[in-house]
Amino acid sequence: MMLYIVFILSVIFVMGFVGFSSKPSPIYGGLGLIVSGGVGCGIVLNFGGSFLGLMVFLIYLGGMMVVFGYTTAMATEQYPEIWLSNKAVLGAFVTGLLMEFFMVYYVLKDKEVEVVFEFNGLGDWVIYDTGDSGFFSEEAMGIAALYSYGTWLVIVTGWSLLIGVVVIMEITRGN
């Protein structure tokens, strides 16, 4: 049952990116990214990454909603173009959806393509050794490693996001 849920989420994930790539208006492109980001967080949650899924959902989608809200407020069209208004855009959208549905049909009919998620040899990536101290949450150890070894990474990431918002605001400000 869980495999089918992940499979359906993966199809919605790809459909969101198809909608983004064939966007006729920036409003619908942002909507496709938001849908794909939310569904991607659901896929991460399904594989046990509850903290990572929640943080990506809150930070990525929250920040993207703020930037998307500002940019669409400054560059809104009076009559936005939809997928059905242009034949080339509609053709790209339908082609992407058909390719996705053919892939789904192929996987479900023949079952020759298998989903493999096996991670062997990840012991080289372990920073903290828990030893014989019992059960530890992998997410808590990852967050501890991020803030102890990755302090500069957190600072550079936060600064990059701030500069990205400022650049987008300057570009969309107009004349």
UniProtKB/Swiss-Prot annotation:
Entry keyword Metal-binding: no
InterPro entries, A to Z: ComplexI_Subunit6, NADH_UbQ/plastoQ_OxRdtase_su6, Nuo/plastoQ_OxRdtase_6_NuoJ
GO cellular component entries: mitochondrial inner membrane; mitochondrion; respiratory chain complex I
Transmembrane segments: 1-21, 25-45, 47-67, 88-108, 149-169
Domain of life: Eukaryota
E.C. numbers: 7.1.1.2
PANTHER family for this protein: NADH UBIQUINONE OXIDOREDUCTASE SUBUNIT ND6 (PTHR11435), NADH-UBIQUINONE OXIDOREDUCTASE CHAIN 6 (PTHR11435:SF1)
Protein name: NADH-ubiquinone oxidoreductase chain 6
